[in-house]
Amino acid sequence: ADVHYCAAHYYDPARALYPDFNPFWEFVAGPLNAGSFGPNTLDNTFGPQVVFQKAPQAPNTSPLAGLQFFGEMRVDPRSRDLTVAFVDINGATVFERTLDAQGR
């Protein structure tokens, strides 16, 4: 996705217009060095829930405003759990979520 903010979305079949799927997560982050702007309205087909979002109040916000993000993912070698984190331009973690490994 071409995004200029960061967000964690959970897609839930119980809330979806089209419910024939397993629930899933979407993590988006950006940009690395460009103007920032917020999200568009989410399509309700897959029942999205915005669990976390950090975006500027105005479009085309300068990178100097500090709203630049990237994501990090770590897999625990023992449990195989996946941890996803959003990090800002200053190196601060602004969001973190651990997902349990499936099928173990």
Regions found by a protein language model. Give the residues of each.
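Long, structured stretches of catalytic cores involved in phosphate-ester chemistry, encompassing
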Residues: 1-104
